[in-house]
Amino acid sequence: MTPSATYRLQLQPDFPFAAAEKAVPYLAALGVSHLHLSPVLEAVPGSAHGYDVVDHSRVRAELGGEEGLRSLASAAREHGLGLVLDIVPNHMAASPRHNRRLWEVLREGAASPYARWFDIDWAAGGGQVLLPVLAGPLGQELEHLAVDGEVLRYHDLEFPLRAGTADLPLPRLLEEQHYRLGWWRLARTELNYRRFFTVPELIGVRVEHPEVFEDTHAKVLELLRDGVLDGLRIDHPDGLAAPAAYLERLDEATGGRWTVVEKILTGDEHLPAEWAVAGTTGYDALRRIDGLFTDPSGAAELLGRYREFAGPPGDRGGDWAATVRRAAYRVATHELAAEAAWLTRLAAAICDRDPALRDHAPWALRTAIRELLVRIPVYRPYVTAGEPPTRIAEETLTDEAVRDAKTVFSVPEEAAAVDVVRDLALGRLGGGEEQAAFCARFAQTASALHAKSVEDTAFYRYVPLISATEVGGDPGQPAVSPGEFHSFASRIARDWPATGTVLTTHDTKRSADVRARIAVLSQCPERWAALVAELTAATPVAAPDPQLAWVAWQSAYGCAEMPADELGERLEPALLKAVREAGLFTSWTESDPAYERAVSDFVAAGPGHGEGVTRGLIAEFADALAPHVRAQVLGAALVHLTMPGVPDLYQGTESEYLALVDPDNRRPFRRPDVPDEKQTLTATALGLRRELPGVFGESGAYAPLTATGRAAPHLLAFCRSGAVVTAVTRLSLRLAEGGGWRDTVLELPDGGPWRDLLSASPGREFTGGTVAAGELFAERPVALLRRVGS
């Protein structure tokens, strides 16, 4: 069955199945239909997230094992709830000690029956797989290696020994293994297994092989057959060799259970129509909802203020497109250099075997691969080697991109390598094994490149309005008009009515309520710039760079309601992560301890200081904007809960929820202490969804409603199936500055009266026809109306 609403719980050793079971009565009363569980299969011990799976055949013991999961499912069913599970088909933990399949592969090499499980280029390593686990070069670490029976130990790591090698001298023993222990820095350029993005601790799994699919999904399918689970969330489908084929096989195996995929859509990109899923996990909806509450003219002015204050070079945070392109080059040539080398080897081998393609030098192929990868505007193309590419696939590698890529070659004839690489990437040069491998690998690398260069680099460099730097977002065009939103929602209702929608997840860089606060700054850029100047003057320790200061002060304002004793300890790690991800002055792999100490000192003295002058200035500013933050928070929540799709609530977000980037947003679930206005709204909307499945479900209709009058652009409204009306105030600060609602009216559908479900006055109703916006929003900046008798 399709859920009416899901509630995401982050399971971890500190919040196992038994703790989730205790929350069931509360969550059932809240109004959701399903619990959405983070991964539950056996993971690396102590894992706080569960995406580092080590055994697909067992439910994680640290969470309570299969018995605990089945008990949770039983308790949920008793309260009318089902379970949706997040699964991870793309990768496993590269931890041999815990991952016994990988252990067998390392012991037996390519001859192991499990060798097909993992995406390893054995030829590139001379028959060995590189394990970049050493703290320094091998020569410096030999003294820390020790043989213990049939096991090789390095500190707390364990590796299997190839049969018959345990008694060899250590240097010879190392040479005889099916793996090579290497310095961790070698992962960047020498790695010969596919990984999750740039994380060598997570090794790619080849679920495109039927036997691997069956082995890795058997337990999940059993839990579905037994009624323990009702639906699935698929993590990172873009990492797979053939996402469409995988989803088709999964749909057949599950009997068509409700399934959504964590597919990040870029710009106006649409989910492939042939995918056998209900839709996405909802980041496309997040971008549209956030954009509704962002002022386009103010965002443009804020960009100017940011440039004046921080003075970033265009390609280091001053211009969005230039920043993305520079970041993409950096990632392609550094963090993903090993992936580029793998593609180059494949392309060179294909060309060497075909006289028509021969004589393209490896350097030219490598250059062509790099230049095309950085020009792909979406995460990846979807292509099957040997089959004609679709129009959408061809649009990922346009003629313009090819022309631009060729400009880096000084000899025009050598630039022909670009044409070869494009044809390989689009599957035009046949469907042989190597061609298929290149096609898949190119798409997988494109996905990793986009994620690392945009989400994990450019989002931390281009920071005029950090509420816009969110997963699936477009900081270059952060605002969304009512017309654009209605167009999106209408398309979802028509094409993907059971898709997921979200505002906050375990991966969002800031919770929805933090982003809502920060987005208000797009309505008062001049006031914000003045405040930053005051804060800068009042802080006794200078920021090590002005871009960091801009981000830090926006973050501090976004968390203004956070308890004073928590602010610093939560803000500092988030900002240190931001500067490391940005990679402008320090990074995860090339850290600058002095710079990072300066960041910590600045945060402690200013943005993270729980009292004093700066805290007072931010509190005063926040108090002045509080009514407009309220409108943003309630408006976004109500739109999310009533628009087409299946809303997913992240744990705690039914009430005010302030969280920063992980791990801050992955703390154990805690029931809100005191119900607030947002929780009342949430429970009312969820109860309505549960009561009226035909109104909000897959057969439900969506109709934009029209407002007229001088303030009409500040009112967004829509009707669901002729029975429920949502109306929200947008950009309320600009509205107030413009004189309020005045003559603005909303045209309600005929067939009233319409009862205000959020009103403190029982029986507050409106007849059909026009209603004055000032009257509609007299009690609060949002309204949820139900046609009496529906």
For every predicted segment, state its role:
Residues M1-P45, V53, S57-E62, R70, ...:
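Carbohydrate-interacting/catalytic domains
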Residues P45-H49, A94-S95:
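Short glycine-biased active-site loop of nucleotidyltransferases that positions the nucleotide triphosphate
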Residues L72-I120:
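Hydrophobic or amphipathic alpha-helical targeting/insertion segments
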Residues N90, I234-L240, Y557:
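Conserved short loop/turn motifs at secondary-structure junctions
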Residues D119-L186:
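DnaQ-like (DEDDh/DEDDy) 3′-5′ exonuclease domain used for proofreading
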